A protein has these predicted regions:
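C-terminal accessory segments of proteins
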Residues: 27-710, 733-779
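N-terminal secretory signal peptides that target proteins for export/translocation
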Residues: 1-5
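Cleavable N-terminal signal peptides of Sec/SRP-targeted secreted and luminal proteins
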Residues: 7-26
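Long, low-complexity Q/N-rich tracts
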Residues: 712-734
Length: 779
């Protein structure tokens, strides 16, 4: 009889083995689900905690501005300098790749924009902080110090003031995002909480190469409608990035607006019916992208201090400081002018620009660039300077520095204001940028070279090194012996109603249509008189599918910027009215357009021998042209008050490794013959007005810590004045009065010293959020 005992035992073993496998798989599956549930619960707790704390910070007379952050186990809050719960703000095209986050971003913007105009955390009120309607916000005392907006453009606080401004925008928008999540059924909310947990508002990098065949201005910003997922399913809504609407009419408190008080924001508008021309806007940005790239790269290579590189204010930054000839603020102005357009769109006017959604994408990018620059010059920060025009929170002539309260932005519900020292680290507001994740010079330097270094794009041997859309030369890396050339522009910020733009060309064009223009290109602009008297009529042309744009609105063949000879646009951003709110002196700014890439192209094609000054100067004298266009059409450069142009150059010191940047720092050599026969191009020496000159550094310390002024009539018992006749402070000086050499024409009183302003704080503070019940966040 056969013995089956061994096979039976074997079958038992096999069965047991498979049972064990099943059990192990089930256990693993269960553990996986358990871990997943734990992760989901943690994310739910995080998002709900953020919403809870942001809502608490909105209670009381003052909003505690924190950006997108909550509290954790540390008492000072978890959005501190160590980066707890800080996440990157992404470029808009990168954010779009995450469908759920993109959906939440749009729905949050829609909810945010639709909030009541009386809601201080609604879009209308937060946009209104910047300029019009010139009203109080967040408990700021009324009446305002002056009938003006709060934004310090053309001032040393430009960069640091906009950081908490963006933070309160992001905070209010994120609150709207959390409200949107709660609209979804409970069984769908976890999906959206997961998306929201790392979501921050995006930026639009207008200087990066968008890639072959891609537009500089993404259609994400230009499409009139967009498809989103709501609780009821897939729906089409008005794109919240396309425009903002005030409703049926512009509120009276706005005091008027472009295009006959048009009740929605416009970009490069045309009439009949009144509408945006986003196709032309994209065409202009395509043509100026290389210039924007070069300006950004040159700024990072300028080695200026952060305070000088971030403001266009001339007295602080250039002639008096000996620094370079451009600033992030000057670059920023060109984006405003190009997006709004000389036909009078909202971005074209400083006091209404913040209502266009593109403003926030643009300013977030400016904050990004200035944040990156902090790692290039880590030992410098806000520069000292004077308020050069009446503002909502300050009088003209007041001296300011890094301890100045950034009104109206409060860090507690008790009304304590942020200072520039408080906002130096972006992570206190819960964000950073992809290029600053390591907080290192080398990371930023590599990113700058990759994104903005001329000629860094890889070309095939058969490729021409030119822009496929405009024919402009793309550039090559800077080499030993090269010179960097710029068109240096000095301008009066508020010389006229609206803004104005300088367009520069190098080459030979056709016949000019304007006898006072230096550019041989016809004027293709629309006179802005139409911007204030448009009469809507039925559309004359069919709309392009999906965008709301009229096909005939933009013809690239008639756009003078679509030329291989086009260098770029330099913008002077003004307000709806000339004069800068009754400023006593012209508000003079300075910046530049790099000419180097275009000159490299002329050398590449054999039109220019070299980039040495002796070859470039006569070439530009013959072949460089520029035209200036304002809201009323083309302008004669020689008639614009305080407008001057010059060509300057500096010898390049190439980068020594991939972790370094080249040196394009000052001094710059003047090439006078390049412009002396052109309008506004004669040699010019800047003479500072009294308000342009910052007080000596010693003047910014608190009384009693040393002589405050430049002779021994200043100070109040200090221990050492540093100027004049070398006095030792002295007890006979007036408290708060400058020495006799400080310019004073009697137009304003002696300046208020920074430390005399209520809320001044010179130290770098720890952010501590305090609620109305007196408890600190996290207790």
């Amino acid at each position: 009889m056969a013995n089956f005992s061994k096979p039976a035992n074997m079958m038992t073993m096999i069965f047991s083995f498979f049972a064990l496998l099943q059990f192990t798989a089930a256990l693993g599956h269960g553990n996986h689900h358990h871990a997943r549930r734990n992760a989901d619960a943690a994310i739910q707790e995080q998002v709900e905690e953020v919403a809870h704390h942001l809502n608490k910070r909105a209670i009381g007379p003052f909003v505690a501005i924190s950006g997108v952050c909550s509290t954790g186990t540390v008492w000072w809050g978890d959005c501190d300098s160590n980066g707890r719960q800080s996440y990157p703000r992404l470029e808009i095209r990168q954010l779009r790749q995450n469908g759920d986050q993109w959906n939440l971003y749009l729905l949050g913007m829609e909810r945010f924009m639709n909030k009541d105009k009386g809601d201080r955390l609604g879009y209308y009120q937060i946009a209104g902080i910047h300029g019009r309607p010139f009203v109080s916000w967040n408990g700021f005392p009324t009446p305002l110090v002056n009938q003006a907006g709060f934004c310090p453009h053309g001032q040393t606080l430009f960069g640091s003031w906009h950081r908490p401004y963006l933070a309160i925008f992001e905070q209010a928008w994120y609150l709207a995002v959390t409200e949107v999540i709660n609209d979804f059924p409970e069984n769908q909310r976890q999906r959206w909480r997961n998306a929201a947990s790392t979501l921050r508002m995006p930026y639009w990098d207008w200087a990066q190469d968008p890639g072959a065949g891609q537009p500089t201005v993404p259609t994400l910003i230009r499409d009139q409608q967009v498809s989103v997922t709501k609780p009821q399913g897939q729906v089409t809504i008005a794109n919240p990035l396309y425009s903002y609407s005030w409703g049926n009419s512009l509120p009276n408190e706005m005091g008027g607006g472009p295009w006959n008080n048009n009740p929605f924001t416009l970009r490069r508008p045309v009439a009949n019916p009144t509408r945006s021309n986003n196709n032309e806007m994209n065409g202009r940005f395509d043509a100026m992208r290389i210039s924007l790239r070069d300006r950004v790269f040159a700024l990072f290579s300028s080695k200026q201090s952060w305070g000088y590189a971030t403001t266009a204010q001339i007295g602080v930054r250039t002639d008096l400081s000996g620094s370079g000839v451009d600033s992030f603020e000057s670059v920023h102005d060109a984006i405003h002018n190009t997006a709004g357009g000389d036909s009078g769109g909202h971005m074209y006017f400083l006091d209404v620009s913040s209502f266009d959604p593109i403003f926030w994408l643009h300013h977030t990018n400016v904050d990004r660039l200035m944040n990156m620059y902090q790692y290039i010059v880590p030992d410098s920060w806000v520069a000292n300077g004077n308020i050069n025009r009446p503002m909502a929170q300050w009088n003209e002539g007041e001296a300011k520095n890094g301890g100045t309260p950034l009104k109206p932005f409060t860090k507690s519900t008790y009304g304590d204001y942020f200072s520039s020292g408080d906002v130096r680290e972006s992570r206190v507001f819960g964000y950073y940028y992809p290029e600053t994740s390591d907080r290192s010079y080398s990371q930023v330097a590599q990113a700058v070279t990759r994104l903005y270094g001329g000629g860094s794009r890889t070309l095939n041997k058969r490729d021409e090194p030119v822009n496929e859309k405009t024919g402009q030369y793309l550039g090559r890396p800077l080499e030993e012996g090269d010179y960097h050339h710029v068109l240096d522009i000095t301008a009066d910020k508020y010389a006229m109603d609206g803004s104005y733009t300088v367009h520069c060309f190098i080459g030979n064009g056709g016949n000019t249509t304007h006898s006072n223009s230096t550019a041989p290109y016809g004027n293709s602009t629309t006179p802005a008189s139409s911007a204030y008297s448009s009469t809507p009529t039925p559309p004359a042309s069919p709309y392009k599918n999906g965008t709301g744009e009229v096909l005939e609105d933009y013809d690239p063949s008639k756009d003078f910027t679509q030329s291989p000879d086009y260098v770029g646009a330099y913008g002077i951003l003004g307000g709806m009215k000339a004069g800068g709110g009754n400023a006593s002196y012209p508000v003079i700014t300075r910046g530049s357009l790099p000419l180097t890439t275009c000159l490299q192209g002329k050398q590449y094609y054999g039109e220019l021998k070299s980039l040495k000054p002796e070859d470039v100067e006569p070439y530009l004298q013959k072949n460089m042209y520029y035209k200036v266009i304002g809201v009323n059409g083309e302008l004669d450069p020689s008639t614009i008050p305080n407008f001057h142009v010059a060509v300057r150059c500096t010898k390049v010191k190439p980068a020594t490794s991939e972790y370094e940047l080249p040196d394009l720092s000052a001094p710059y050599e003047l090439l006078p013959k390049a412009t002396e026969n052109k309008p506004a191009g004669k040699p010019f020496t800047y003479t500072p007005s009294p308000i342009d000159i910052p007080l000596p550094d010693a003047s910014y310390g608190e009384n009693g810590n040393g002589g405050h002024y430049d002779n021994n009539n200043g100070g109040n018992g200090g221990n050492g004045g540093n100027g004049g006749n070398g006095g030792n402070g002295g007890n006979n000086g007036g408290n708060g009065k400058p020495g006799t050499s400080y310019p004073n024409t009697g137009v304003f009183p002696y300046p208020t010293l920074p430390w005399q302003e209520q809320g001044y704080c010179a130290s770098v503070q720890t952010i501590k959020y305090v609620y109305p019940d007196g408890k600190a966040a996290g207790y």
